[in-house]
């Protein structure tokens, strides 16, 4: 299959054999693709190598045969966000999450748009924690494993003042006892879940519980094996948490 002048975001790049690269990209029309960029060493290929960097938005042409395609041409369409510190680690996180959860060639049209929006939020450092929670919600919904964020697992509308455990398969389950602080630590309030459902930024105090709750859900869908970016962010923050 010939792919011509398709736009994509670069997710990951690694060496492939002696002079080539394996480039993972996210496209709107074809989903996630793995492309081999051959012979990219040398001064003449400097512009191409610069375009094939994580977070870069590119236009490319390729020939797709089997699992991996052959990259024929690529050019940068903008300047990739220049990130540092926790924002840079957040970019590693969203890319690793995509690589681990989204299979190649799966139709993910809406996720491409969500990635584009998250990339711009990272560029402007706009409500980082909230931006990541929105992206996590979008990736789960795109993969068909999201859940209703307005009702609990029994179909009862969420109480904004209550606390809920997020069951990876059934959705929010109300915490029966509000007095156990250890249990409440890993729960999300009804208020923050409703905010996530409607994409309305909540009170900052609710975001820590939502982060831990979403991590448990993601860990389930990751087969119990965590992300390297979680470890990097934990080291950066000196605590064992996900972004």
UniProtKB/Swiss-Prot annotation:
SUPFAM superfamilies: Nucleic acid-binding proteins
Keywords per UniProt: DNA damage, DNA recombination, DNA repair
Gene Ontology cellular component terms for the protein in this record: bacterial nucleoid
Pfam families for this protein: RecO_C, RecO_N
Keyword Cell wall biogenesis/degradation: no
InterPro entries given in the database record: DNA_rep/recomb_RecO_N, NA-bd_OB-fold, RecO, RecO_C
Alphabetical GO biological process terms: DNA recombination; double-strand break repair
Membership in a protein family: Belongs to the RecO family.
Function: Involved in DNA repair and RecF pathway recombination.
Name of the protein: DNA repair protein RecO
Naturally occurring in which organism (per UniProt): Xylella fastidiosa (strain M12)
């Amino acid at each position: 299959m010939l792919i011509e002048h398709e736009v994509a975001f670069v997710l990951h790049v690694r060496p492939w054999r002696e002079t080539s690269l394996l480039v993972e990209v996210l496209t709107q029309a074809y989903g996630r693709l793995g492309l081999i960029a051959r012979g990219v060493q040398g001064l003449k290929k400097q512009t191409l190598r610069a375009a094939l960097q994580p977070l870069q938005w590119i236009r490319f042409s390729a020939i797709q045969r089997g699992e991996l395609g052959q990259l024929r041409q690529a050019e940068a369409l903008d300047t990739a966000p220049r990130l540092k510190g926790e924002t840079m680690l957040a970019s590693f996180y969203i890319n690793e999450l995509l690589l681990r959860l989204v299979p190649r060639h799966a139709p993910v049209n809406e996720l491409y748009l969500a990635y584009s929006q998250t990339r711009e939020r990272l560029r402007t450092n706009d409500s980082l924690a909230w931006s990541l929670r929105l992206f996590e919600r979008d990736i789960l919904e795109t993969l068909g494993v999201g859940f209703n964020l307005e009702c609990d697992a029994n179909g009862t509308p969420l109480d904004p003042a209550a606390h809920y455990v997020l069951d990876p398969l059934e959705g929010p389950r109300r915490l029966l006892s509000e007095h156990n602080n250890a249990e409440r630590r890993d729960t999300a309030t009804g208020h923050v879940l409703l905010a996530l459902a409607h994409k309305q930024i909540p009170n900052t105090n609710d975001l820590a519980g939502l982060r831990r709750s979403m991590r448990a859900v993601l860990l389930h869908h990751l087969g119990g094996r965590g992300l390297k970016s979680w470890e990097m962010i934990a080291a950066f923050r000196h605590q064992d948490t996900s972004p």
